[in-house]
Amino acid sequence: RTYIDTEGIKGVSIEPGFGNSLLFDDEAYEPLYQLLEEQEMILMATFSGSITPVLDPSLPGRFQKIAKNHPGMKAVAGHGGGPWVREMVCAAFFAENIYLAPDLYSVNCPGWQDWRDAAAGLARDKILFGSSYPLCSVSRAVENVKEWGLFPEDERKIFRENGAGLLGLK
């Protein structure tokens, strides 16, 4: 709480299941989620089947549950929630506070076409740009999004507007 007040921190990043046995909806995270909601802050959760020994920690319902239980907290699924792309797109569409950052999984990974479709359609306001540098360079991440073949206004949302809105910079 001290750093929120003195440093203007906008959010916190967690990695459930990576080096620990916690799941998104583990009660141990509840005080953090409550604080983030009270302060209207951002939760950036690394969300990917590739970082955990089993897929259970990354099930979309767990992430959706905490977002719905804390509507004042903005919840970003880092790596976009893969491999559960379609499920996460639906979760973001139905929950005002869920955002998706597909970053290095934006092309040539299972479900990447769903990112493209979501960015051009029902989740166009929920897709955030990211690279996961150094795993994927910023220039490569930009090229990946451009490969989606979106209209310029949809690219603008991904590259700037959606992130600016999330951070309260609009």
Regions from the PLM with identified roles:
Residues R1-I51:
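Active-site gating/metal-coordination segments in enzymes
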Residues Y3, V12, L36, H79, ...:
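Conserved, mostly hydrophobic/aromatic
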Residues R1-G8, Y29-Q39, K65-H70, V89-E96, ...:
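Acidic (Asp/Glu)-rich catalytic clusters
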